[in-house]
Amino acid sequence: MSDRLFIFDTTLRDGEQVPGCQLNTVEKIQVAKALEVLGVDVIEAGFPISSPGDFNSVIEISKAVTWPTICALTRAVQKDIDVAVDALKFAKHKRIHTGIGTSDSHIKYKFNSNREEIIERAVAAVKYARRFVDDVEFYAEDAGRTDNEYLARVIEAVIRAGATVVNIPDTTGYCLPSEYGAKIKYLVDHVAGIENAIISTHCHNDLGMATANTMAGILNGARQVEVTINGIGERAGNTALEEIAMIIKSHHEIDIETNINTQKIYPTSRMVSSLMNMPVQANKAIVGRNAFAHSSGIHQDGVLKNVQTYEIIDPHDVGIDDNSIVLTARSGRAALKNRLSILGVTLDQEKLDKVYEEFLKLADRKKDIHDDDILVLAGADRSGNHRIKLEYLQVTSGVGVRSVASLGLNIAGEKFEAAASGNGPVDAAIKALKRIIDRHMTLKEFTIQAISKGSDDVGKVHMQVEYDNQMYYGFGANTDIIAASVEAYIDCINKFTK
């Protein structure tokens, strides 16, 4: 019988630490439900003590999903654990993920402590967490740069204290695969009682080795992997769930299995990309748009004769459907709801009605509606509780003349109008906006992304605005790229005028 590899998804915790990728609670629930359908074993739902938003998200996700274990992150601090316990009170299966830094640099500079004291704090945290839950995971932060002998002492102590999972993070993404694999093997061979806990990997991609290190860990005895959808995460990201799942599925000689329904990988990838406003690079393994594209004549000829000549993965195995349905203005609510369900998106009736209204408006402006358009519609409406909303926008522009824009805003129910000229339509529109919103804001980043193909398709705009020495990220989506730009700017403003 094959060994079981447990999939611990941290998209909603580590993945959400990417600047500009923060989700609201409704969106987090949407992702959590998709992860449940995908088949992940553990969902790390947040760091409850870090913010009221994270605390509430853990509570609501615990209510929304049934069979995955819901995990809450803490430091090795009693107050953190108390808050995590409270946040997990509705979870059917619950886990506390507590830990402390173990490398010499963390011990000396972060904690101003010593090795023995760190072990004492680690043991105390695990014992305290075990008073409330049966499933406690311990992380040895910066284990990648912790010497193996001391790391083994820490891990042995926390297992004796009751840890059920021991997480060995390559926090800085520094380890070579051979080095990381040897570290896991050292723990397997030298930690008394290691058979009483599951060894987990948690690898970062700073040097592009997250997936390789994770596989090295698996091959040397790790039986849980901590991953994110699309490899999203802090700095250069984390190990990508889709890569590990398909490596395990493709290499039968490893004799390990997961619970992942691989046909849900691609829809989940697209949904997370859309909700987090984080495009997937074209050449990304498994889920990039070029992952199964062949431009070389020799490759094309081989694939036409037999796909196995150059394709080691069947696109259908990851949920890529060549015959995806194209919706039109004549498509009804049921067709839209069904397509959203296939894409991993579940909406309540009120939200579905709003999305359907926007769908009909979009269908009037363009002939065919594709999956990416639908995902944008399902994730783009964040204006419900916004204080500032765009009422109208009119722009006059041409070659050799300055652009002129006039717009109207609704600010907490009060109407405002302004006009301005500028060097191009976007510049004019933003200058008009600034005449109403009299704040000193600096546009730091402005990115336009085409969602699908065709001149009438939806465009997404991502903006980064600096205000009062803080960075705010905004998003807009519209078939009119000028309107999308204004929506993105307003989205930024709403972040600091709550």
Regions of interest found by a model, annotated:
Residues R4-L5, T11, M246-I248, H252-A419, ...:
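A mid-to-C-terminal "edge-of-domain" accessory segment
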Residues L5-I7, Q17-V42, F55-A64, Q78-I199, ...:
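Alpha/beta enzyme core
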Residues Q17, Q22, Q30-V31, D368-Y472, ...:
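Non-catalytic terminal/interface segments that mediate subunit docking, oligomerization
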Residues C175, A182-K305:
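Catalytic alpha/beta core domains of metabolic enzymes, predominantly
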